[in-house]
């Protein structure tokens, strides 16, 4: 074990002098010596980011750097940050270092793993084509999820990423009897609190491990907390289990990387992001994968700055995903929730060889009808509906019904909406949209399709409206 001395401290960046022959390696964890000061955080951990030469290393503090000063003693641990893994983590809330923050005693785990691991080799990977039913109509129809696949929920501020994530947790984690890991990366503490109570009420808390590095924490914590959660998920996967891994929010992971990069003095690249953006994203995403022993199905919320999907951060995330669910402010403005854009969202699974001919034909029929409506909108706005041909009028009427039928009451939003949540099986989703596209519902008013589950409910609602 090598001992060092703090020589410079600028915010979260701390430079430490070691003897030249005992320089710690990159990513090694260092801790503040116990007898240093009553003002600094006890047992503060620092992670080596750069070797500056002459025995000096540049580190990022994984905690508050308040109270640090030159001359303080630092001890090298000789290893990267390691966190507890295994069944002892289930039902617990931990921080980036795997320490419990739920005041429920120490974590009982015999094994610790370093948060920096190599991604599985190519010959260990196992591609999956099995569908994962979510019970959310628009997702199951247009951008179906694969078991063991990666899903991104893209959306600007306030269009419903977290609510959609919570509904997916509600529908998948409760139905799927397996284990889940939730990583809260730079999000609101209130959301983490709500999530904990939601899991507790639904009696699935003992199947979820939670790791949080929230908005108010230093950039080092927010940058590493996704890796901590992933390390816990990898352990369960390597035991041969099928794991669900939820990350809210990947953009904050990128943002923490930007902050750390600026503090380390790197030259920024496009839009001020770190020059290592693609590499950092790759390091995380390449590890979130399914092997021949077990699978990780990951669902990641991705904040889109200023609703610009071409921003480097969401654009870098796109290429790693199997399904992309794009939430649109225009659709949210119409009062249609979930505000998923069926023309912008996509999935590799939407292939007739995977989902079957009927599902594929219905999904494409729905998209074609909506696309036709989108093209006709300008004409309708200028000249009105009367100027359209009979075929176009019919297409518009069906598109408006489809648009409303894509809405659905959520279980997690019951407290706000007052209407009970609906879980719609995939077969019912396909049957409902097939009937609308084929013109079997042309006689029904479009209001009958708003916020219902199955097509049968739409028929019942139509009777009440008449």
UniProtKB/Swiss-Prot annotation:
Q: What is its main location?
A: membrane
Give Gene Ontology CC terms.
plasma membrane; proton-transporting ATP synthase complex
Key words of the record: ATP synthesis, ATP-binding, Cell inner membrane, Cell membrane, CF(1), Hydrogen ion transport, Ion transport, Membrane, Nucleotide-binding, Translocase, Transport
The entry's localization annotation reads: Cell inner membrane
Q: What reactions does this protein catalyze?
A: ATP + H2O + 4 H(+)(in) = ADP + phosphate + 5 H(+)(out)
Name one molecular function that GO assigns to this entry. Answer: proton-transporting ATP synthase activity, rotational mechanism
A Pfam match: ATP-synt_VA_C
* Top-rank EC class of the record's enzyme: translocase
Q: What is its EC number?
A: 7.1.2.2
The topology of this chain with respect to the membrane is: Peripheral membrane protein
Q: What does the similarity note say?
A: Belongs to the ATPase alpha/beta chains family.
Q: What does this protein do?
A: Produces ATP from ADP in the presence of a proton gradient across the membrane. The catalytic sites are hosted primarily by the beta subunits.
Q: Write the protein's name.
A: ATP synthase subunit beta
């Amino acid at each position: 074990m090598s001992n060092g001395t703090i020589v410079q401290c600028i915010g979260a960046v701390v430079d430490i002098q070691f003897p030249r022959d005992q320089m710690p390696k990159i990513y090694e964890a260092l801790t503040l010596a116990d007898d240093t000061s009553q003002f600094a955080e006890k047992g503060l951990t620092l992670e080596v980011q750069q070797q500056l030469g002459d025995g000096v290393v540049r580190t990022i503090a994984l905690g508050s750097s308040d109270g640090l000063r030159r001359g303080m003693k630092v001890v090298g641990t000789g290893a990267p940050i390691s966190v507890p893994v295994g069944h002892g983590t289930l039902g617990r809330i931990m921080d980036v270092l795997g320490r419990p923050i739920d005041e429920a005693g120490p974590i009982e785990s015999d094994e610790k793993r370093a948060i920096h691991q190599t991604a599985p080799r190519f010959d260990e990977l196992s591609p999956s084509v099995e569908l994962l039913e979510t019970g959310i109509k628009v997702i199951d129809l247009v951008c179906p999820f694969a078991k063991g696949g990666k899903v991104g929920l893209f959306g600007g501020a306030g269009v419903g990423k977290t609510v959609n994530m919570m509904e997916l947790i509600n529908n998948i984690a409760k139905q799927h009897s397996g284990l889940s890991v939730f990583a809260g990366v730079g999000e609101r503490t209130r959301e983490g609190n709500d999530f904990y109570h939601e899991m507790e009420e639904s009696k699935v808390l003992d199947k979820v491990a939670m790791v949080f590095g929230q908005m108010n924490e230093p950039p080092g914590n927010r940058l590493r907390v996704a890796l901590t959660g992933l390390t816990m998920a990898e352990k369960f996967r390597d035991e041969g289990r099928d794991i669900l891994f939820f990350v809210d929010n990947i953009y904050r992971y990128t943002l923490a990387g930007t902050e750390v990069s600026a503090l380390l003095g790197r030259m920024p690249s496009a839009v001020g992001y770190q020059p290592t953006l693609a590499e950092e994203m790759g390091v995380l995403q390449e590890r979130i994968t399914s092997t021949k022993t077990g699978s990780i199905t990951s669902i990641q919320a991705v904040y889109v700055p200023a609703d610009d999907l071409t921003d480097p951060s969401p654009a870098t995330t796109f290429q790693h995903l199997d399904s992309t669910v794009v939430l649109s402010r225009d659709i949210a403005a119409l009062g249609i929730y979930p505000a998923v854009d069926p023309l912008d969202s996509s999935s590799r699974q939407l292939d007739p060889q995977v989902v079957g001919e009927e599902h594929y034909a219905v999904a494409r029929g729905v998209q074609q009808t909506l696309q036709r409506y989108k093209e006709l909108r300008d004409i309708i706005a200028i000249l009105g509906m009367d100027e359209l041909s009979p075929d176009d009028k019919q297409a518009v009427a069906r598109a408006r019904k489809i648009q409303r039928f894509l809405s659905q009451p959520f279980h997690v939003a019951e407290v706000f909406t007052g209407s009970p949540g609906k879980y719609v099986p995939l077969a019912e989703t396909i049957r409902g949209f097939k009937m609308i596209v084929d013109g079997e519902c042309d006689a029904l008013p479009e209001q009958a399709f708003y916020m219902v589950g199955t097509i049968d409910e739409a028929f019942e609602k139509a009777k009440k409206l008449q």
